[in-house]
C-alpha cells in the first residue's frame, strides 16, 4: 500500500508540474486571466462575493475590449463556482480567461480541480498572467525520515522532511555508572546497571513505536539510529524494537553528542543514505526490468511504438515512463473515411507531411498531446499501473538513454516480432534527441 501511495503521489506531482509549466507560459492580450485558489475551510460563497464585487469594479476599465474580456472571465469563474455546493475537502483551484494560442489567436481557457492533497493558500488575481507559484506547495516531494539519537543521558526523536527538522519527542534518563567496589557490592551494582539499561532500552522502543507509528501505519520512509555508545547498536538488534520499524533502519551512525547537537551531526552523516532511499522504488522497478531483459524472459517491452501498442491491447501490467519524455500523441482523421488514428512521434516530426497522408487521402490533425500527460490521465483505463522514472538515479539514467525512456512489464509472454501496429509508420528509435 505504501508503494502504491508513493506511485500515485508521483503521478499527481507530474500533473501539477506540467500544469504549472503550461499556465506559466500562457499569456493573454489583456488583463482577463483569473487565478483563484480556495483553501478547504473557506466558503465558496466568500469567493463568489469577492469576484462579484470585482466584476462591479471592472466597469471602470476604460478600454472596452479589455473590459469585456475581464468581465467575461469573471462570469466564467462565477458560473463554474455555482457547480460546487461546498468547498472540496482539499480545496479548489481555478484558472480561466481569454488567452493566446500558438497561432496568436484568442481562445477561452477554463481549468478547475480539487488538488490531491489540501492546499492552504488563499489567492485571487485577475491580470495578464496566471499565478501558479502557490501550486508549488503541492510538490513537496521529500519523504519524512525518522531519527533516534540516544546516549547515556537520554533519547531524542525527530523527523526530517526536506530541509525541515522537527523534534517529536525526548526524555532524559539517569543510568548508574560502573562501580569501583569489589565483592558482593560489585555484583549487585552490575546487576542493577544491566537492569536499568534494559529498562531504558525498552522505553526507547516503546516511545519509538508511539512516535513513528500512527493509526497502525509507519509515518516515516526510513529510520536513522544515532548515538555515542553501544545503545544504538543494541536498539537495532533487540527483540523489543517494533519489527515494522526495525525493517526501516537505513543507517546507524556514531555521533559525538546527544540531544539536538547529535541530531544535527546524524543528519549530516546520513545524507547519502537518505538520497538513496528517495529513489529506492525507482531503482527496484528498473533493476527488475533489466533482469527480465538479461534473461530474455519475453515479459517486458520497450520503445514507444511497441509499448503503446501493447498498452492499447491491454497486455501491459506496469508501464514505465521517463517523466520528461517529449513524445507527442497525435490524433488524425481521414477526411474521406472519417477514420480516427493515432501516432506517436517526436516534436520535430509534427509538421512532416508524410504523417498526414494515407495513400491518396489527406489526414487532418485533430489533436496533439504530450504522451506522458496523456498516460497520466488514461493509464488506468487499460488496467495498468504507471511508474514515472527520473534520470536522477544511475538506473533511471540508463533506462532513459538505453531504452527510449518508455517500457513496461507484460501480463504474459508475448512474441514481440509479431506485433502488428497499423500506425507504426515512424521508426522512433532512429531519431536522435527524442528525449
UniProtKB/Swiss-Prot annotation:
InterPro entries: eFR1_2_sf, eRF1_1_Pelota, eRF1_1_sf, eRF1_2, eRF1_3, Peptide_chain-rel_eRF1/aRF1, Ribosomal_eL30-like_sf. Pfam families: eRF1_1 (PF03463), eRF1_2 (PF03464), eRF1_3 (PF03465). Signal peptide: none annotated. It is found in: Cytoplasm. It comes from the Eukaryota. GO terms for cellular component: cytoplasm. Gene3D superfamilies: 3.30.1330.30, eRF1 domain 1 (3.30.960.10), eRF1 domain 2 (3.30.420.60). One of its GO terms (molecular function) is translation release factor activity. Keywords: Cytoplasm, Protein biosynthesis. Heterodimer of two subunits, one of which binds GTP. Belongs to the eukaryotic release factor 1 family. Directs the termination of nascent peptide synthesis (translation) in response to the termination codon UGA. In T.thermophila UAA and UAG codes for glutamine. NCBIfam families: aRF1_eRF1 (TIGR03676). This is Eukaryotic peptide chain release factor subunit 1. It comes from Tetrahymena thermophila. The gene is ERF1.
Amino acid at each position: 500500500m505504501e508503494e502504491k501511495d508513493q506511485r500515485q503521489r508521483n503521478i499527481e506531482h507530474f500533473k501539477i508540474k506540467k500544469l504549472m509549466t503550461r499556465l506559466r507560459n500562457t499569456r493573454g492580450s489583456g488583463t482577463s486571466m483569473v487565478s483563484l485558489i480556495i483553501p478547504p475551510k473557506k466558503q465558496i460563497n466568500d469567493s463568489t462575493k469577492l469576484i462579484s464585487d470585482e466584476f462591479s469594479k471592472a466597469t471602470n476599465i476604460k478600454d472596452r475590449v479589455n473590459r469585456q474580456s475581464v468581465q467575461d472571465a469573471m462570469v466564467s469563474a462565477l458560473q463554474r463556482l455555482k457547480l460546487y455546493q461546498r468547498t472540496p475537502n482539499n480545496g479548489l483551484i481555478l484558472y480561466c480567461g481569454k488567452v493566446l494560442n500558438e497561432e496568436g489567436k484568442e481562445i477561452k481557457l477554463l481549468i478547475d480541480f480539487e488538488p490531491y492533497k489540501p492546499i492552504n493558500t488563499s489567492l485571487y488575481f485577475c491580470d495578464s498572467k496566471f499565478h501558479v507559484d502557490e501550486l508549488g506547495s503541492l510538490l513537496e516531494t521529500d519523504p519524512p525520515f525518522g531519527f533516534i539519537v540516544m546516549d547515556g543521558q537520554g533519547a531524542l526523536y525527530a523527523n526530517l522532511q526536506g530541509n525541515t527538522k522537527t523534534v517529536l519527542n525526548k526524555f532524559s534518563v539517569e543510568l548508574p555508572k560502573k562501580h569501583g567496589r569489589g565483592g558482593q557490592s560489585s555484583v549487585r551494582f552490575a546487576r542493577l546497571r544491566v537492569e536499568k539499561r534494559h529498562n531504558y532500552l525498552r522505553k526507547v522502543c516503546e516511545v519509538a513505536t508511539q512516535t513513528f507509528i500512527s493509526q497502525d501505519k509507519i509515518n516515516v520512509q526510513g529510520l536513522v539510529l544515532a548515538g555515542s555508545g553501544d545503545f544504538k547498536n543494541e536498539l537495532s538488534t533487540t527483540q523489543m524494537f517494533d519489527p515494522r520499524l526495525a525493517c526501516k533502519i537505513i543507517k546507524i551512525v556514531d555521533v559525538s553528542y546527544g540531544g539536538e547537537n547529535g541530531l544535527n551531526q546524524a543528519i549530516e552523516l546520513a545524507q547519502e543514505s537518505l538520497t538513496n532511499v528517495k529513489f529506492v522504488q525507482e531503482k527496484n522497478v528498473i533493476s527488475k526490468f533489466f533482469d527480465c531483459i538479461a534473461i530474455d524472459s519475453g515479459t517486458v517491452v520497450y520503445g514507444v511504438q511497441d509499448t503503446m501498442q501493447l498498452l492499447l491491447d491491454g497486455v501491459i501490467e506496469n508501464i514505465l515512463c521517463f517523466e520528461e519524455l517529449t513524445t507527442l500523441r497525435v490524433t488524425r482523421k481521414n477526411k474521406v473515411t472519417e477514420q480516427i488514428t493515432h501516432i506517436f512521434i517526436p516534436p520535430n516530426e509534427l509538421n512532416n507531411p508524410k504523417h498526414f497522408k494515407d495513400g491518396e487521402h489527406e489526414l487532418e490533425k485533430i489533436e496533439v498531446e504530450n504522451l506522458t500527460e496523456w498516460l497520466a490521465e488514461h493509464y488506468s483505463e487499460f488496467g495498468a499501473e504507471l511508474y514515472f522514472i527520473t534520470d536522477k538515479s544511475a538506473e533511471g539514467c540508463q533506462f532513459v538513454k538505453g531504452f527510449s525512456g518508455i517500457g513496461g512489464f507484460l501480463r504474459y509472454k508475448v512474441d514481440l516480432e509479431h506485433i502488428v501496429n497499423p500506425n507504426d509508420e515512424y521508426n522512433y528509435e532512429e531519431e536522435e534527441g527524442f528525449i
